[in-house]
Regions:
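Solvent-exposed loop/turn and edge beta-strand elements of beta-rich ligand-binding domains
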Residues: 1-199
């Protein structure tokens, strides 16, 4: 009949063994059990279970929670493989919803401006991710580097899947012009050049 059983909200909480024992239920009634909150780091079991209470019997129900996944972004120099700090990324679901530092999707848990920055070891770690497709968009390369690919797709699988994505940046190039005396090979000061991009 929809009447709540338990505390004033009809809520029971598991003990240290992950169990709840409910006694004194009236035989012949059907009870619907719905998980309303998963433990930290786990996905909620959305499947409600209905059970018929029988006189003198204790019925067991099992709910299973899958661990959430983790994403590790590693930023590296494309030539040397050295880690790069200071790269900035925006992480979204395939549907375009922004992901926060703790993996929760929505406005309340976003990092500052929704941007993740690689640390001194060139990494970003995001935990508590639900299985699904994500898009990593590099919005700023580290100083002295150019972006090789602005977006990378990654899929977090079920069962606590951890995905490590290595994204590289190419160091910016340089140009050295030497102006020398053709006879003495001494450097010549004050010479002007015009530099343009080739077609």
């Amino acid at each position: 009949d929809g009447t709540l059983i338990g505390d004033s909200n009809g809520i029971y909480r598991t003990d240290e063994n992950g169990e709840i024992l409910i006694s004194g239920l009236q035989p012949g009634k059907s009870v619907v059990v719905t998980e309303t909150q998963a433990p930290p780091g786990y996905l909620i079991d959305t499947q409600a279970q209905t059970v018929q209470i029988k006189e003198g019997r204790t019925v067991s129900l099992n709910f299973k929670n899958q661990p959430k996944g983790e994403l590790i972004i590693q930023k590296r120099d494309s030539a040397t493989g050295q880690p790069l700090a200071g790269a900035q990324f925006r992480v979204t679901t395939a549907a375009g919803c922004e992901v926060g530092l703790d993996g929760v999707i929505g406005d309340s848990t976003l990092t500052q401006n929704g941007i993740f920055t690689t640390d001194s070891s060139g990494e970003i770690r995001i935990t508590n991710l639900a299985p699904g497709a994500y898009v990593l968009t590099e919005i700023k390369a580290p100083h002295g580097y150019v972006m090789d690919a602005p977006s990378t797709n990654v899929v977090i699988g079920e069962g606590g899947d951890t995905q490590t994505v290595v994204i590289t940046n190419t160091p910016k190039g340089g140009l050295v012009i030497n102006k020398l005396d053709s006879v003495t090979h001494e450097p010549l000061e004050g010479v002007e050049f015009t530099i343009t991009e080739a077609d």
